Amino acid sequence: MTSTSIPTFPFDRPVPTEPSPMLSELRNSCPVAPIELPSGHTAWLVTRFDDVKGVLSDKRFSCRAAAHPSSPPFVPFVQLCPSLLSIDGPQHTAARRLLAQGLNPGFIARMRPVVQQIVDNALDDLAAAEPPVDFQEIVSVPIGEQLMAKLLGVEPETVHELAAHVDAAMSVCEIGDEEVSRRWSALCTMVIDILHRKLAEPGDDLLSTIAQANRQQSTMTDEQVVGMLLTVVIGGVDTPIAVITNGLASLLHHRDQYERLVEDPGRVARAVEEIVRFNPATEIEHLRVVTEDVVIAGTALSAGSPAFTSITSANRDSDQFLDPDEFDVERNPNEHIAFGYGPHACPASAYSRMCLTTFFTSLTQRFPQLQLARPFEDLERRGKGLHSVGIKELLVTWPT
């Protein structure tokens, strides 16, 4: 990057499973840099590990301010409906506390056999297929949608429709503000309808637990509950699909590491930590607005400035990780921040780890000879949205 140029997001990504080279360039030469967004606005991007953690835990960087009606539409959908990523302080604490009542250790324990059954069914479908096949279509997408269906207590078809709206809304650089607004309106309407049904007829699912707890405690308004559930839907559908697919691509590209998991399932839990560090579901996240003048890494940010962090970049910082661009399923220590950091860290990290560990353990034991059916270098990126950095398809094969 020259001293006068401003990179435009989304950045080019020659290798779909790898972060954009632009992130490395910024991290090394301009760790707090201006970038141009699809909306045409300019925002700051923070890319180094310590600086990213600092921003994520600094109250002067406000999610709520980013969603205020007076703020420019740096990312249009942020202002369309409140969520956990657009509130701060006591309101955010109350929302997380309510969500934690649903995502408690007991719930995760009850979900473990459910997750195992979903994984087993998907792998049964894979075994019944004739290779080569698209792993994402047969395994990743069904698992992601069925996991969310169980959390919400709805049919997988409903989740598929929700996911379509999320995917379109996140593609602001491709479809324009008007379509983004329409998609978010449809998404909010669907979530509100589901919430009302759960209040009328609660079930044994996360959404019913949250809805009933909020009715008893009067912690949040219906609009705030909807916003919280939107966060769950956004992060809980597309992200697992991308992490499963990208993670498997990395394992099969480094076939010796896949074989380590085949030989010793006890290594899978640590491998999951490397998979989420190495295979991000996003390149930038956590839009915030600076509420007072602040200096980050020697760069002055004035009050009112929009700022993003890149956890993806932070997790490739050589000051934090030895050989950060090497994929190592036995990396130790591995103090990544793939699930975020500070007050807005992912509240479902324990549940996500359980799901990923269950999946990769089962996969490596049932398909020990799984391999890529086309060169790793030929993988194609799926879309150019703000959220997912997934692969279009992942063709795999195995001896029959």
UniProtKB/Swiss-Prot annotation:
Q: What is its EC number?
A: 1.14.-.-
Q: List the disulfide bonds.
A: none
Cofactor(s) recorded for this entry are:
heme
Instruction: List residues binding heme.
Output: 346
**Mind listing the UniProt keywords for this protein, alphabetically?**
Cell membrane, Heme, Iron, Membrane, Metal-binding, Monooxygenase, Oxidoreductase, Transmembrane, Transmembrane helix
**Where does this one sit in the cell?**
Cell membrane
Q: By its UniProt entry, which InterPro entries does this protein fall under? A: Cyt_P450, Cyt_P450_B, Cyt_P450_CS, Cyt_P450_sf
User: What family does the entry list?
Assistant: Belongs to the cytochrome P450 family.
Record-linked PANTHER family: CYTOCHROME P450 BJ-1, P450, PUTATIVE (EUROFUNG)-RELATED
Its recorded name reads Putative cytochrome P450 141
Organism in which the protein naturally occurs: Mycobacterium tuberculosis (strain CDC 1551 / Oshkosh)
